[in-house]
């Protein structure tokens, strides 16, 4: 587990990167919010802005932060990396 406050490495799944590219072309305000959430996640993965919450059931081990009412940033911590899983829509439990 990372040491609190230590800057993590950032990686993306292909689907998450496609989500991010979507926001680059569609909504700069949402993109700015995602960037702020990621910056905070890199320093404090389990607390901070966006109401971080651990996910359950088949998404156990993943975390979610609110981008807005509809969209979530979903990520996990893998060794010393923050892995972004999604940054568009809601996660799909079950």
Where are these regions (language model features)?
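Enriched for short, Lys/Arg-rich terminal
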Residues: 1-9, 18, 22-32, 36, ...
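A short, surface-exposed loop/turn module that caps and links secondary-structure elements
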Residues: 39-66
């Amino acid at each position: 587990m990372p040491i609190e406050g230590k800057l993590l490495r950032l990686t993306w799944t292909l689907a998450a990167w496609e989500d991010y590219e979507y926001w680059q072309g569609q909504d700069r305000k949402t993109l700015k919010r995602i960037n702020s959430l990621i910056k905070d996640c890199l320093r404090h993965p389990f607390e901070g802005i966006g109401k971080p919450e651990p996910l359950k059931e088949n998404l156990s081990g993943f975390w979610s932060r609110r981008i807005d009412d509809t969209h979530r940033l979903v990520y996990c911590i893998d060794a010393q990396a923050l892995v972004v899983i999604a940054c568009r829509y809601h996660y799909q439990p079950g």
